[in-house]
């Protein structure tokens, strides 16, 4: 009986130590990823945060996650988060909304909703817009209100006929990567179509975020473009998911968006050219004057 109790006690101790080691390894791996890739993982604040995180000895997985979340806000900012394992394994469904195009006396009104579908659905998203566009227009409205993000490539590909090359750049701590139409279309698997030369009005609001903001920035600096509405959410940055031992993902902000103007955007809202609560009406009125 005593022997059995001793064995059970030793087993409990070993399990406790093993769990503690696993929790510390979880924190160390996350800190390593943040230290090497996090956009803001530099300077004294990060050094102090890193030191504090590694000095912790979490006894539960929940404690380890909390430590990582606190460090993540410093290394990656507000756009970074931990995606739980059960969300990582969820199959992408077709519950996303399709874009739409309405023609109004020579003006195309294009609604681009957020998108997180698969490759085939992405091509459907793009073709829905391209198939509805005539070759000649007097103007276009691109409605990004409520576009909270997802996969930016179908969004940009859907409106590539209004865009010249050199769309924008992604800048991380070490270098920057240019993004142009050919790259976008190659990723989506859509053939390039002829450019439509017309003025473009873009609508934004406080729900325009992430990939929605990246789509907006592709038009920044073009002379025949004007933005109407309210400031965006301020998530114009690049995220990368890193797998963690528990099946979750560390979704870390690794770069910022740079417009063709050279302006760099990340956590600050993008302010429209015309602040208005009636963006569609003002956009149409502006296009009719061009």
Question: For each predicted feature, which ranges?
Answer:
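Sec-dependent signal peptide recognition
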Residues: 2-9
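C-terminal motif of bacterial Sec signal peptides marking the signal peptidase cleavage site
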Residues: 17-18
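Terminal peptide-recognition signature
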Residues: 30, 71, 110, 142, ...
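Extended, small/polar residue-biased N-terminal targeting/export presequences
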Residues: 39-105
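STAS-typified acidic loop motif
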Residues: 99-123
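Short acidic catalytic loops
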Residues: 110-111, 132-149, 202-203
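A short, well-ordered alpha-helical element
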Residues: 118-138
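Gly/Ser/Thr-rich loop/hinge elements
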Residues: 149-201, 237-243, 247, 254-258, ...
């Amino acid at each position: 009986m005593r022997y059995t109790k001793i064995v059970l006690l030793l087993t409990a101790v070993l399990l406790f130590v093993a769990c503690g080691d696993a929790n510390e390894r979880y924190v160390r791996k996350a800190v390593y990823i943040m230290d090497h890739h996090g956009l803001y993982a530099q300077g004294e604040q990060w050094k102090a945060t890193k030191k504090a995180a590694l000095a912790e000895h979490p006894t539960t997985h929940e404690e380890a996650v909390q430590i990582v979340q606190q460090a993540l806000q410093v290394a990656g900012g507000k756009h970074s988060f931990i995606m739980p394992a059960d969300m990582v394994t969820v199959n992408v469904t077709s519950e996303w909304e399709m874009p739409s195009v309405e023609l109004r006396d020579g003006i195309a009104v294009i609604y681009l909703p957020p998108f997180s579908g698969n490759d085939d659905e992405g091509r459907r998203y793009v073709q829905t817009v391209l198939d509805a566009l005539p070759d000649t227009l007097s103007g276009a409205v691109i409605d990004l209100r409520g576009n909270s993000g997802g996969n930016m490539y179908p969004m940009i590909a859907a409106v590539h006929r209004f865009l010249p090359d050199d769309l924008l750049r992604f800048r991380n701590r070490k270098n920057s990567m240019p993004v142009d139409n050919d790259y976008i279309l190659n990723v989506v698997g859509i053939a390039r179509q002829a450019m439509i030369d017309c003025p473009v009005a873009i609508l934004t609001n406080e729900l325009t975020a992430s990939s929605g903001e990246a789509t907006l920035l592709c038009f920044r600096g073009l002379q025949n473009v004007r933005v109407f509405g309210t400031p965006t959410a301020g998530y114009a940055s690049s995220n990368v998911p890193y797998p963690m031992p528990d099946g979750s993902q560390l979704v870390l902000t690794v770069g910022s968006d740079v417009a063709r103007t050279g302006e760099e955007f990340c956590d600050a809202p993008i302010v429209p050219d015309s602040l208005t609560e009636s963006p569609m009406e003002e956009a149409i009125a502006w296009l009719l004057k061009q």
